[in-house]
Amino acid sequence: MVPDGMSFLQLFLIAVVQGLTEWLPISSSAHVLLASDFMGLVGRDEVLINAASNTGTLIAMLLYFRKDVGAAILGGFELAATPVTKRPLSAGARLARCIIVATPFALIGAVIYESIAPETLWTALRSVYAVAASTILFGALLWWADARGGQSRSEGDMTLRDAFLIGASQLVAVIIPGTSRSGITMTAARALGYERVEAARFAMLIGAPILAAVSLYGLMGLAGAPAGGEGATIADGLIVAAIAFVSGYASIGLLMTLVRKMSFLPFVLYRFALGIALLATSPIVAGAIG
């Protein structure tokens, strides 16, 4: 039973939206933002439900890529114990090093988002027109990079320079809603010539520390968040996390299956359709978001 007024349908839709869109290159923030606003989630409700859905999708990714995650964790210990000039690093240590190099940029972007730029800028970037425009624009950029990028580079070819560039691209996604963090990092990796499977895999792996930080930040913010209208409870959060886990795991499997067989074009076309739909319904959506 779903307590305190929140319907199971509300919880189910928010969780499925987050789970399906977090790892696909189609902007989870735009989808969750619109879904939350349409359902009237505010204050503590929104913080709790978003933190729970983020946690569910994070666990899904960690489980799906458990071998890579395990190798990276062991590689991190290897990095700490191995002087720079000593023996060659294992594949796990090289992966851990690239993740470490790529991760901070999203956190830097979050600091900028929260504390530096004026509120008027964030209001403008959060408008339906800005979200629609970035959804279409960065979809076109993914299309270009996917068509231009080769398929000659794989996991073993990842350099610190490449990790730096892929990581730096996350700044755009953090600052501009609708960009898609996973989408922009896959775009950067494809532009650098990494094969599609590798681009998708690395984009998701470097998202793990970021999503963990976002989830923790959201949970820490529960105490100070104003009460929401529906009275979301911890039980609601657990339901959302479980559903987001299932849908997130399924979406990762779908993505990895598709990129092994075809290009990113289906996601590009979806972004175009979403952007056009947002613009077409802008009087209604603008009122909901604004």
Identify the role of each PLM range.
Residues 1-290:
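Multi-pass membrane proteins that catalyze or facilitate reactions on polyprenyl-/lipid-phosphate substrates
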